C-alpha cells in the first residue's frame, strides 16, 4: 500500500500508527525455508515440523516509525494519513516466535531493521522509477544479503 501510494505522490492511509508488526525482507523467510529444506534433505527428522522465520524480537518497529523510515527514499513531506476505523479490530502487537528456528536448525535473521528498510525502499523506488535494471538490483541485493550472512557467520551461508 505504501509504495503504490507514494509512487502516485499520495499519503498512505493507516489506521493504527503505534501497532507493531514483524517487518522483514522477503529474503529472511526464504533463507529459513531453504536452510530447513537442506536439513530435511540430509535427515527426515525435521520433516513436518513447523517453524517461524522472522525478525529478532529487539528489531520491532511500529507502523509509524516504519513508514517514516521507508518514505525517506521517496522524498515525501506527508507520507501517511491516519484514518479512523472501528471496522478492523487489530492487535497492537504482532510478533513471530523464532526461538525454535534458532534452537533446532540454528537459523536467525540476517538483516537489521535499517538494512531491511534500505533494501525494500531501494527496490521499490527502482521498480517505480526504472533507474537501473531491476533484475540486476535484485541479484545485487541477494549477494549483499548472502555476504552479510557469511560475515555474521550464519551456518547456512558458510
Which stretches of residues belong to each language-model region?
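NAD(P)-dependent short-chain dehydrogenase/reductase
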Residues: 1-40, 44, 65-73
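Conserved C-terminal active-site "lid" loop/helix of NAD(P)H-dependent oxidoreductases
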Residues: 26, 50, 87-108, 126-130
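C-terminal "lid/loop" region of Rossmann-like NAD(P)-dependent oxidoreductases
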Residues: 48-52, 64-67, 75-93, 134-141, ...
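Amphipathic terminal alpha-helices
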Residues: 113-158
